[in-house]
Amino acid sequence: MSPAVEFAYLRPINYQRCQNFKLWSLVVSIEKRIIARELWLAAARPGDIVKPIWFLLLVISMVPLALTPDSELLAEIGSAMIWIATLLALLLNSEHFFQSDFSDGVLEQWLFFDRPLAWLVGLKLTAHWLLHVLPLILISPVIALTLSVPGDVSIALFITMLVATPALTCFSGLGAALTLGSSRSGILGVLVMMPLFVPVVVLASGVLIRAMDGSETLPLLALLGAFSVASAVLVPIAVSLAIRVNIGGSN
């Protein structure tokens, strides 16, 4: 990778102040620079992190008003409502998954790196999960307790979200990559992602139903984990192919 390409990639991260760029290029790996750029974008646009959290809280706060304040009913449907709200919150940010990288030309520069494009996409998906999805997972047990959801079901909810959301994040990235550069990327992305979301949601709801009944949840959790692992391995390859096609079509 030439110094010109490296400098062009670092410019959106605002590293021009680095006094010794050659030393920086030698010391800092490509992976660290990609993570640093994601952190910089998150700091520059904190609303992208806060917006899904506020959306989740808003939807959950409307449930007792729209249905009933009965604690027994809320305890039965609370975990399912949190899952639905989390799913909608993930869709909220999926439209802009690769948009800033595509507009800045960063995706084109990825093609010149001495790393597989699928590996770089995997780093991007991991950073997105840590910054945008993990906060939703961490607050989900607290929200479940406010809806009178039993403690064991709240724990099952937390585990299912922790295991299942990597697959949902991968599918969100795939939908965003397939519709990259489209004027109606939001609608098209949802149409692409929803069929992929269905198996994950079905397995997660099965875990929650078994948790409420006091049945064994480990087999479904193992299947859900295998689904996420397979998605983490295969989806970045599909996303990298979609990015190559979209970049080739835009030139």
Residue ranges and their predicted role:
Residues 158-177, 229-230, 234:
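Hydrophobic alpha-helical transmembrane segments of polytopic membrane proteins
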Residues 91-111:
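Transmembrane helix boundary and interhelical loop/hinge segments in multi-pass membrane proteins
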Residues 65, 175-215, 219-223, 227-233:
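Transmembrane helix segments
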Residues 78-98:
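Long, hydrophobic alpha-helical segments
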Residues 122-148, 167, 171, 204-205:
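Hydrophobic alpha-helical transmembrane segments that constitute the membrane-spanning cores
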Residues 24-52:
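Aromatic- and glycine-rich beta-strand/loop motifs that create alpha-glucan
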Residues 232-251:
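Junction motif at the cytosolic side of a transmembrane helix
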Residues 46-68, 83-87, 192-203, 229-235:
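Hydrophobic alpha-helical transmembrane segments of multi-pass membrane transport/permease proteins
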